[in-house]
């Protein structure tokens, strides 16, 4: 382990990756040694784009190039830790080799959040090929995992909506305050950046209205249920905001 932790971010050009890069760049114990984007960022004979070219606010803060992601290039950076801000299937494919090479992996996708591999086809659209890692992954909320995070090799960072629900609901369930025979009802509102940085008409600001989506079938519901121990009825809403989440939670008290 190096004196300053050598950090690689895969998925740096996305909103989450850029926020992470900015935070780590100012951390005294971290050194950013590699930024990677899609594996489609193949060389064209020109210099790779800098992250600050994609996010001008990071000029002078994170001026590293963003290169095409592949396992060999990532490991060539000699990282102590790798953050995967990548799609679920990409994280599931990359993590095993990185772990085998001795890197600590922080996965920001949902690829290792659920302990039951059979839930992935229904909620995330792919068969999980590394089910054994699901029992090894440590859920990345300190309020849930506690000291287990100190020695974890694979950290499954929590989802956005689940974080807003688990933090208030889990302690109430554990204390016996909530009636577990009744569902906990969650109405959440999220800003548009939660949909990612890819161009899409539905994400254009003038196209955004207050609207529910994923009603009774949102992929974050099983994660909430797993980590709270409660039955969850969850309805998310898209609102015309840049960022942020507001969750209004209704629960019946135990008799």
How should each PLM-predicted stretch be described?
Residues 1-213:
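N-terminal Rossmann-like NAD(P) cofactor-binding subdomain of oxidoreductases
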Residues 194-255:
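Charged docking surfaces used in two-component/phosphorelay signaling
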């Amino acid at each position: 382990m190096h004196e300053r932790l050598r950090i690689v971010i895969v998925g740096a050009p996305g909103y989450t990756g850029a926020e992470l890069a900015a935070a780590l760049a100012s951390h005294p114990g971290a050194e950013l040694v590699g930024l990677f984007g899609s594996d489609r960022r193949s060389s064209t004979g020109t210099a790779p784009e800098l992250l600050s070219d994609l996010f001008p606010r990071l000029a002078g803060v994170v001026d590293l190039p963003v290169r095409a992601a592949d396992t060999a290039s990532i490991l060539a950076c000699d990282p102590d830790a790798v953050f995967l801000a990548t799609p679920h299937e990409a994280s599931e494919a990359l993590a095993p080799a990185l772990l085998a090479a001795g890197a600590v992996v922080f996965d920001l996708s949902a690829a290792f959040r659920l302990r039951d591999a059979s839930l992935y086809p229904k909620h995330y659209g792919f068969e999980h090929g590394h089910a054994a890692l699901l029992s090894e992954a440590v859920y990345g909320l300190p309020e849930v995992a506690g000291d287990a995070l100190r020695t974890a090799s694979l950290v499954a960072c929590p989802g956005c909506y689940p974080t807003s629900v688990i933090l208030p609901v889990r302690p109430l369930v554990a204390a016996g305050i909530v009636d577990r025979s009744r569902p906990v009802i969650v109405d959440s509102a999220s800003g548009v950046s939660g949909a990612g940085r890819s161009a899409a008409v539905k994400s254009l600001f003038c196209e955004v209205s207050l609207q529910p989506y994923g009603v009774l079938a949102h992929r974050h519901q099983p994660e909430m249920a797993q980590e709270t121990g409660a039955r969850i009825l969850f309805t998310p809403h898209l609102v015309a905001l840049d960022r942020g989440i507001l969750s209004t939670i209704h629960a019946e008290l135990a008799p």
